Amino acid sequence: MALNLFDRGAPFDEEELANRYRHILSPEDRDRLPAYAALCDALAESRTALELLGAVQARQQNPTLILAILHYLALTGHLVLGPLYGELHEGHPVTPEAFARSVIEVLEAEPALLRRQLWRSTQTNEPNRSAVLAAAIGDVARTLGHSQITLIDVGTSMGFNLFPDHVTVLDRDQGDDAALVTECFTPGFVRSPVPFIGRRVGLDQNLLHPTKTDDVAWLTACLWPEESRRLRRFTALLEQMKQWPEPVRVAGNAVDLIDYEVTFDDTPTYVINSWVLAYFSLEERAQWRNTMDYHFAEREDLVWISMEHPSINDTLRFPEAPKNVPRPGASEIVVTSSFYPSIHWGWSHPHGHWFSVDSGPKA
């Protein structure tokens, strides 16, 4: 236990925070992103980086926040970080350890720059997850006979995942920057179309809007700079979003808002969440599950599709995840509906690069 100079001497667990830096990337992503992997390792060894993370409110003590702030400083003109990250954006080869050392030098020399941004929250809501969510929504809607739905996205950020019916999904990159690319590991799986979405609702405590310059800069910063394709996709989808229907955006705690939204009308309602429930306290997760169970009992056409790390799902009274994880660090997709108990549907890369389908509600 150490004292945090950035938080009035509040104690923090150095080893716990160091391990968060070391393990924030999955083994698969560490192989794909050598510069970011080296940076995460260097952050774990930096006393200043530990103190900065320790100064963040508990539910946001995620190393992705520090990574995003560094990227944000680069995007907004920092004289040293800008060129460093620019090399990654352009896909130029860099020496991972040298990149990490240079970034750490800035962090330790100018910690106040990062300190001023600790109020922010990481809200990526990766658009490529829509490629997987679209498969799950289509499969469940086909099984349950739903031709029109309301879609509610919990932790919506900028709202990309409210449009699974508007995106192009491919199984390999064909040069279309706006297309989502995901590989299905399940032989013979055939996608069913996403039903007509009549109402789209995004819930988030910190809504981001595609027309606000700083919101766009911050969400760009939440992406990983070595993924040039992902950055191009974000820009292309922002442009396409101008032509999409304007969703309903509601700011606030989803636990407080969900009652109204799932009873808005009698259209079959699908609630989705992806990598957001980790930011709920244990008490909030229990309250969320109880609230959803109440509405499952009250109406016949409510569906909840959850895409989270299995350790989060364990706190939601979901069945124990099967052991057939295709790759370490995968997210588990669990489907719950008014007619069926929570059931394991499949696995996915956290950013939707691949997915597998194991089961689903059976009519």
Region annotations inferred by a language model:
Residues 2-112, 116-123, 127-133, 149:
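A short N-terminal interaction module
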Residues 52, 56-61, 73, 78-79, ...:
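Class I S-adenosyl-L-methionine-dependent methyltransferase module
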Residues 122-133, 227-230, 250-255, 284:
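Phosphate/oxyanion-binding active-site loops and adjacent basic polyanion-contact surfaces
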Residues 129, 154, 250-253, 272-274, ...:
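Short His-Asn-centered micro-motif
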Residues 132, 136-139, 218, 275-276, ...:
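Short, hydrophobic/aromatic alpha-helical segments in well-folded domains
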Residues 158-163, 279-281, 313-315:
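Short catalytic/ligand-binding loop motif for oxyanion handling, primarily in non-cytosolic enzymes
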Residues 213, 222-233, 247-254, 262-265, ...:
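Domain-level detector for long C-terminal conserved domains
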Residues 268-283:
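A short SAM/SAH-binding and catalytic strip from SAM-dependent methyltransferases
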